[in-house]
Amino acid sequence: MSRITVVRLDRDALDLPLASEGGRVRALLWPGMGARERSLCYFDLPEGFASTEFRHPYEAVYYVVRGEGRVVDADSGTAHPVHAGQMIYLTPNQGYRLDGPAVFVGGPCPPDPSLFSEVL
């Protein structure tokens, strides 16, 4: 059966403990709502705040919605500056962290169950 689902960030998103205190990560699309092939998270990371470090067995992509942050290579420590309007592509098993001040939208595809382990 086909269906269309519209998700509102302010009402429907699920808070996830994936950022340092002061940052906020919210799942917009995740397995708990029936999504099996895709996940999408909203990262709001103010100046001085960061996501936790990730390493997925799948590809991941992020779009920078607002701000000028960084994506940090967890293996080398190299920081890559990013700004609104840019896309970040990460290969499978690439460790990384997102740093503010920026808003990022994205995640691994398919969903990485470890991101949702505390809520599933």
Features from the language model and the residues they span:
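Histidine-centered metal-chelating micro-motifs
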Residues: 49-52, 70, 77-78, 86-97
